[in-house]
Each structure stands twice: as C-alpha cells, then as structure tokens.
C-alpha cells in the first residue's frame, strides 16, 4: 500500500465505527420510544395491519386493535398471545370494533379507545379499500365510498384523538398512504384521489402539529402482497375479485411492517417503500411531467386493449 492508502484506511474504519455507533444508538432510542407506548392500529385483522400488530406487539407496545370483524380481531389477539418473545415486556391487546367509513362510529370508537387506555401515543391509520375501474363507468357513490374509508375515516379518527395528544404533549400519527398518493395511474382514479387527499392532509397536519411536539409519518408503499386488489371495488360497487400480477409480485406485508416499525421508531416524516420503477416514476412526475403523462397514456392504452381482447 502507498502512503495515501494508509492514510485513507484509518479514516474509513473510523467512519464505519461512527456509523455503526449511530445505528446502535438509534435502535436503543427506538426501543425506548416504543416500549409501553399505546399504539392504535386500524384495519388490524388482515394484510399489513395484521403484520403491524405483530411487530408492534413484539416491541412491547400496548396495542388497541381496530377493525370491523369481532371474530377477526379475536383471532388476532389469540395469535399474538401465542407468540414467544423474551426481549420485551408484553401487554394484552385491547379490541375496538367499528366501521371507519362511518364518521359517527369513529367518534364513539375514539372515546372508547381513550376510556380503555387513558391516552394514545401512536395512531397508525392503516385501514383502506382499493378500487379498479374506468372513470366513465364509475358511479359517484363509489368515489364517495372510497373517499369515506381512505380519507374521511382516518381524518375523523385523527381529529378525535389529537386533543388528547396535545394535552399530553406527546403523540405520533402514522398514515399508510400509497405511491398513488404521489402519482396517479390509469383505472385507479377513486383510489389515487383518496390517497392524494390523504397525502395533502397529513402534510398540513405535520406542520400544524410541530409546535405541540407531535410527529406525523406518511408511509407510501408500492405493491404489497395482500388481498387488497381481491377486495377492491369496481365502478358499480361490486367486488373486483382478481389478484393483480403486480400485487402478487409485491413486497410481503411482513417486510413492510418491519419498515413501518423502524420509521416510527426513527420518527421519520415520510417514507417511500417501493421498487425502482415506481420510485423513478415519482421523480419523473415532478422533474419531467410531460414524459410521465406520455407513459401513463401508453399504459392506459395497453390496459384497455388487454381488457377488450
């Protein structure tokens, strides 16, 4: 080795050491931040919500699991109770059953949550519904239904719980949005509109909550291998019932749940959890919108031909 190499080598080792120490301290802070925190998760009975329940339970949080199915929530609580984890003190989860699209039910649910736990430290707005259809064939009632579940529901629950967070000078609001909160793709109009609205609301909320030391994290995943597309609604409100190829090849909910856990522990403001192509599309939409629009027009034409064939 020459003298230059010998000079760089200690600097490289030192940099690696400092970075490793930083990551270790970050993990320790994350663990302390999550231990015994009251965490509310909506849409907890399936998919990403279910996996989030597992990883946050394992982290020693006090869970409040929310969903429409009492049976589904009971099955999840039983599954959690059978987990064997030695690294954290575990707490039996609470269950709150309600329909997120019913604003009156949301307000009652928020009161029930606060009655059960006394406070909410972390709210994870996860519940949602997907959509497939053409704009021309989609009833306005379907647009409203998707907006009620994906936008107005999380907004109502967040607004109902924020006052208690402000009172305690502690809180963290998380929303599981989508890459489609950043870009719009053909035949997803109602879904993408709801996620764009979600992105905008929680971006505003982040700024307005900063004086109260309340964190806001927006997670924008790409395709996740769940039943979201199977349970999607179509333009007339019927069930789509098809597992899209992109969804089938997406990230596992376990992987995304771990990413959400880290994002919360690190108190990230925003996180894009997507592959190379969707990530590039997000930047292309901003930096070269004309090219992006051309790609989307070509995609719409291709998908329309496939449906007509």
From Swiss-Prot:
Enzyme class per UniProt: oxidoreductase
The record's annotation in CDD domains points to: 11beta-HSD1_like_SDR_c (cd05332)
What topology in the membrane does the UniProt record assign? Single-pass type II membrane protein
Listed binding positions for NAD(+) are 46, 48, 191, 195, 226
Statement: the UniProt record of this protein carries the keyword Endoplasmic reticulum: yes
Give its E.C. classification number: 1.1.-.-
Subcellular location(s) of the protein: Endoplasmic reticulum membrane
**SMART domains referenced in this protein's UniProt entry, alphabetically:** PKS_KR
Topological domain (Cytoplasmic) residues are 1-4
Q: What is an example of a GO molecular function annotated in this UniProt entry?
A: oxidoreductase activity
Query: Looking at the keywords, is NAD present?
Result: yes
Q: Give ranges for the Lumenal compartment.
A: 26-272
Chain segments annotated as coiled-coil in the UniProt record: none
GO cellular component, alphabetical, reads: endoplasmic reticulum membrane
Give the stretches traversing the membrane. 5-25
Q: What does this protein do?
A: Putative oxidoreductase.
Give the record's family classification.
Belongs to the short-chain dehydrogenases/reductases (SDR) family.
- What is the protein's name according to its record? Dehydrogenase/reductase SDR family member 7B
Q: What is the lineage of its organism?
A: Eukaryota, Metazoa, Chordata, Craniata, Vertebrata
């Amino acid at each position: 080795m020459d003298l230059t190499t010998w000079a760089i080598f200690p600097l490289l080792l030192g940099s690696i050491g400092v970075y490793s120490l930083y990551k270790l301290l970050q993990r320790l802070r994350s663990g302390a931040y999550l231990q015994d925190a009251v965490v509310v998760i909506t849409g907890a009975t399936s998919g990403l919500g279910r996996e989030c329940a597992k990883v946050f339970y394992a982290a020693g949080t006090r869970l409040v699991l929310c969903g429409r199915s009492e049976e589904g929530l009971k099955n999840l609580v039983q599954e959690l109770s059978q987990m064997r984890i030695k690294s954290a003190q575990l707490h039996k989860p609470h269950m709150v059953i309600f329909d997120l699209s019913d604003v009156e039910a949301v307000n009652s649910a928020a009161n029930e949550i606060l009655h059960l736990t006394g406070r909410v430290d972390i709210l994870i707005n996860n519940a949602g519904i997907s959509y497939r259809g053409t704009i021309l064939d989609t009833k306005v009632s379907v647009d409203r239904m998707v907006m009620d579940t994906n936008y107005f529901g999380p907004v109502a629950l967040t607004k109902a719980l924020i006052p208690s967070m402000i009172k305690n000078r502690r809180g963290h609001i998380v929303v599981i949005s989508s890459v489609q909160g950043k870009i719009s793709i053909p035949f997803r109009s109602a879904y993408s509109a709801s996620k764009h609205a979600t992105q905008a609301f929680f971006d505003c909320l982040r700024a307005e909550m900063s004086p109260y030391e309340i964190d806001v994290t927006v997670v924008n995943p790409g395709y996740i291998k769940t039943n979201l597309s199977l349970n999607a609604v179509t333009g007339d409100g019927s069930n789509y019932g098809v597992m899209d190829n992109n969804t089938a090849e997406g990230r596992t909910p376990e992987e995304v749940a771990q990413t959400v856990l880290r994002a919360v522990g690190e108190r990230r403001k925003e996180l894009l959890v997507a592959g190379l192509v969707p990530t590039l599309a997000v930047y292309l939409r901003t930096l070269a919108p004309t090219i992006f629009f051309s790609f989307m027009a070509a995609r719409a034409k291709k998908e329309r031909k496939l449906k007509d064939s």
